[in-house]
C-alpha cells in the first residue's frame, strides 16, 4: 500500500510539473523578412519576456509571397503584424481583423527623389516618373496625388507610376525620378549604393499628412470573444512592448538578436544597427495603445484614394483598446 501511495504521489508531482511547464502557445506571423523592423518581438523572446508571461511564442518570418491576412485566415497564426490599410481592406472583404495594439506611432514611408531631376516640392512631381509599391502600399500615395490634384495616368500635368519592386534599382538606374522608401531600410540602400543625402530630396508621408498606421498587431475578431484568448493576448502585448522598450534602449544588442534569428544570413550588422536606430524613432513613446486620431486620419486618407480606394466606407469594430487597457 505504501508503494502505491508513493507511486501516486510521484505521478501527481510529475503531472503538476508538466502542467506548470506547459506555457500557452502563440504563433506570430511577421509582415516581412527577419529584420530590425520586428526587433521588439525577437528581443521579447530572447530576453525571456514571453516566458515570464507563461507564453511559448513562435515567430514566423514573412516575405514577398507571404500575406499575413491569408496566413491568419488559414489558421497558420494566432496573431499577425500588418499595416492598417491592408488590414482594413481585408476586413471590408470579409476577413474580420482587429487591431489590438499599435507599437509604431509614426510612419516610416516616404518618396525619395534625385535632386538633379529638379524636384524640390510635390508640385514638381508633374511630368515625372515615380516608383510606387503596390499590394496595398500604393493607397497612401494615390490619396496624396488625389489631394494634390495630380493625375496618375501620365502626361505633362500628371505623374507616370512605375510599379516598383522591393528594391531601389529604378532610382539608381534613372528609370524613375523618385522611388518609395522606408526611413529605416530602402533609403539607406540608396546611400549604400553611392548616392549621398545631398543628392536626394525626401518627402515623408508624415510631413505631407497622408501617412497611415504601420506594423500593428492584429487578431481575428471572433477570438476576442474567448476570455482565455484575450488573457493570452494581454500577456503577449505586455511582453512585446517590454521587448520594444528594451530594443529602443539597447539598439546594438537588439540588432544582434535580430541577426541571430535571421536564418537566411542575408542581413548585415551595419544595416541592422542602423535600421534599429531608425525604427526606435517610430516606436518612441509608444505604449502600444492605438491613437484613435491616427486611426481616423488613416481611414480618411484611404477614403480619398481616388477612383479605386482601398476601402469604400468607414469600418466599424476594426480596433479595440480591450487588450492594451489590461496590459498596462
Feature-to-residue mapping (PLM):
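Short, glycine-/small- and polar/acidic-enriched structural segments
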Residues: 24-164, 170-173, 177-184, 203, ...
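Sec/Tat signal peptide C-region and signal peptidase I cleavage site
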Residues: 15-22
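Bacterial N-terminal signal peptides that target proteins for export
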Residues: 1-8
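Secondary-structure end/capping motifs
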Residues: 225-306
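Cleavable N-terminal signal peptides
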Residues: 9-10, 20
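Periplasmic-binding protein-like
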Residues: 103-113, 196-225, 277-279, 317, ...
Amino acid at each position: 500500500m505504501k508503494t502505491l501511495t508513493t507511486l501516486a504521489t510521484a505521478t501527481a508531482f510529475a503531472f503538476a510539473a508538466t502542467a506548470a511547464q506547459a506555457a500557452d502557445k502563440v504563433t506570430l506571423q511577421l509582415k516581412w523578412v527577419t529584420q530590425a523592423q520586428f526587433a521588439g518581438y525577437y528581443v521579447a523572446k530572447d530576453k525571456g519576456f514571453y516566458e515570464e508571461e507563461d507564453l511559448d511564442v513562435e515567430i514566423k518570418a514573412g516575405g514577398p509571397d507571404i500575406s499575413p491576412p491569408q496566413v491568419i485566415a488559414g489558421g497558420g497564426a494566432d496573431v499577425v503584424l500588418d499595416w492598417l490599410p491592408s488590414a482594413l481592406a481585408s476586413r471590408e472583404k470579409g476577413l474580420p481583423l482587429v487591431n489590438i495594439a499599435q507599437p509604431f506611432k509614426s510612419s516610416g514611408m516616404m518618396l525619395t527623389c534625385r535632386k538633379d531631376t529638379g524636384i524640390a516640392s510635390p508640385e514638381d512631381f508633374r511630368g515625372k516618373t515615380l516608383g510606387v509599391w503596390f499590394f496595398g502600399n500604393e493607397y497612401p500615395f494615390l490619396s496624396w496625388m488625389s489631394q494634390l490634384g495630380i493625375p496618375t495616368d501620365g502626361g505633362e500635368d500628371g505623374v507616370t507610376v512605375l510599379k516598383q519592386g522591393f528594391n531601389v534599382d529604378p532610382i539608381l538606374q534613372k528609370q524613375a525620378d523618385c522611388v518609395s522608401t522606408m526611413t529605416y531600410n530602402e533609403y539607406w540602400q540608396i546611400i549604400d549604393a553611392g548616392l549621398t543625402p545631398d543628392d536626394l530630396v525626401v518627402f515623408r508621408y508624415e510631413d505631407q499628412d497622408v501617412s497611415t498606421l504601420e506594423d500593428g498587431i492584429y487578431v481575428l475578431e471572433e477570438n476576442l470573444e474567448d476570455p482565455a484568448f484575450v488573457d493570452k493576448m494581454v500577456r503577449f502585448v505586455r511582453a512585446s512592448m517590454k521587448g520594444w522598450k528594451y530594443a529602443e534602449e539597447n539598439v546594438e544588442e537588439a540588432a544582434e538578436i535580430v541577426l541571430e534569428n535571421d536564418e537566411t544570413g542575408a542581413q548585415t550588422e551595419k544595416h541592422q544597427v542602423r535600421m534599429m536606430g531608425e525604427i526606435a524613432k517610430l516606436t518612441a513613446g509608444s505604449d502600444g495603445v492605438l491613437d484613435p486620431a491616427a486611426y481616423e486620419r488613416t481611414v480618411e486618407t484611404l477614403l480619398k484614394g481616388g477612383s479605386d480606394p482601398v476601402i469604400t466606407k468607414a469600418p466599424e469594430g476594426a480596433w479595440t483598446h480591450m487588450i492594451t487597457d489590461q496590459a498596462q
